[in-house]
């Protein structure tokens, strides 16, 4: 390494900032699966060039060149998501990576594995034909307007505590459960009535509401739950943690709303009907007889896991409801039947990624953004009081589902392997474009 070289801090920072806005789009190869502390590929490309180049040439001048350092071997003994490995290979170098975490080893092998796009598409189409119909049947409801069966995108749930007096209290912090991410510009919101449990439309910040179904007057901003406590109808305050069942069972959960899409592609919220409850109960019965996906491993003690264990989440199976277990089991069965090991492992990696968005620790981010806030949105494992149940297979307008993650993550990552690009910012217009500047 030539010590007289200068690292192009400002140029790389500008590119890195753009990359960070949509990392899964701008460097899809490293985002087929969740990993913590992921590094930016543009930064690592520049760092590797700085370390490898012996000349005094400005590193930035060679950033967009196609390189062939086949006489160089890069070692990363703590490779994590594989950014160092991937960027080294793009520069034509040899790369060796390892990690103490087996997830890392599996993940990096899958993201760098070259597979036929045609074979990948064929396997996905087979899953869509043979597996998705059974899953999609589990996510449907009766349209309030047409009376027809229509797809459900998301179900809304709330945890319920039982006081020593036997009163059941839903853990709503407020009764506004859905609003736009830019609420000041689009103030329309969805409200659940605490009396009749019907859904109606209101405004995100309104403090006085009258339920059009039962006439109940209430403040949608004031739910019974506040931070670590809950208030009974008689005004008594309890610590939520003190109301966790002593027999080791989980808190009760109630399904209270859903978001469906009609045949015209229009989304609308609905209250829960008898049909929805019966459908869920039917699936619960089927789970008793068949579920390949049953992660019964114990949740081991730890700083974060103890937060879940404190609410009686003792096995990883507890993180999913029965419909999720049933549908994920169907999907896993289909994936395990894929004959090609290489293709099968690609879909197993995608299946694992799908779990992040399909469990009862997810929540609703709202409209105007990706709807599902996944389990690892924060580095904690505290149970979600108002969990969101996603549709496992999903639809074109879904967020965080198997079918959408296949198209937006796995497929994009494989296409990137064939055409690895770098972001380029025009110095005059500041417009961003893509440049092929790497070995395939």
Describe the predicted segments one by one.
Residues 1-75, 85, 89-440:
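Nucleic-acid modification enzymes, centered on SAM-dependent nucleic-acid methyltransferases
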């Amino acid at each position: 390494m030539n010590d007289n070289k200068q690292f192009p801090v400002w140029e790389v920072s500008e590119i890195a900032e753009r990359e960070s806005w949509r990392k899964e789009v701008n460097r899809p190869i490293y985002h087929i699966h969740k990993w913590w502390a992921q590094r930016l590929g543009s930064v690592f490309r520049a760092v590797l060039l700085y370390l490898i180049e012996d000349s005094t040439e400005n590193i930035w001048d060679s950033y967009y060149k196609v390189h062939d350092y086949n006489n160089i071997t890069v070692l990363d003994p703590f490779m994590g998501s594989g950014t160092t490995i991937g960027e080294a290979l793009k520069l034509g170098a040899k790369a060796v990576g390892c990690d103490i975490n087996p997830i890392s080893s599996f993940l990096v092998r899958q993201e760098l594995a070259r597979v036929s796009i045609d074979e990948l598409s064929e396997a996905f189409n087979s899953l869509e034909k043979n597996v998705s119909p059974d899953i999609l049947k589990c996510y449907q409801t009766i349209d309030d307007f047409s009376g027809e069966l229509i797809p459900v995108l998301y179900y809304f749930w709330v945890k319920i505590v039982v006081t020593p007096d036997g009163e059941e209290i839903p853990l709503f912090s407020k009764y506004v459960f859905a609003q736009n991410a830019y609420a000041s510009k689009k103030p329309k919101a969805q409200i659940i009535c605490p009396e009749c449990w019907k859904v109606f439309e209101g405004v995100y910040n309104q403090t006085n509401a009258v339920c059009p179904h039962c006439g109940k007057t209430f403040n949608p901003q004031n739910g019974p739950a506040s931070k670590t406590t809950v208030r009974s109808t008689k005004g008594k305050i309890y610590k939520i943690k003190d109301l966790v069942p002593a027999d080791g069972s989980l808190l009760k959960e109630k399904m209270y709303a859903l978001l469906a899409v009609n045949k015209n592609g229009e989304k609308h919220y609905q209250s829960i009907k008898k049909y929805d409850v019966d459908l869920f109960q039917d699936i619960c019965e089927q789970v008793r007889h068949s579920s390949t996906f049953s992660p019964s491993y114990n949740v081991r003690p730890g700083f974060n896991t103890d937060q879940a264990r404190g609410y009686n989440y003792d096995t990883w199976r507890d993180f999913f409801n029965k419909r999720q277990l049933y549908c994920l089991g169907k999907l896993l069965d289909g994936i395990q039947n894929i004959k090609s090991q290489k293709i099968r492992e690609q879909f197993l990696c995608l299946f694992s990624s799908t779990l992040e968005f399909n469990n009862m620790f997810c929540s609703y981010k709202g409209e105007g953004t990706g709807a599902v806030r996944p389990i690892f949105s924060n580095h904690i494992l505290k149970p979600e009081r108002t969990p969101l149940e996603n549709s496992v297979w999903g639809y074109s307008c879904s967020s965080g589902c198997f079918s959408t993650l296949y198209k937006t993550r796995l497929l994009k990552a494989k296409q990137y392997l064939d055409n690895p690009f770098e972001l380029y910012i025009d110095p005059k217009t500041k417009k961003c474009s893509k440049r092929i500047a790497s070995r395939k």
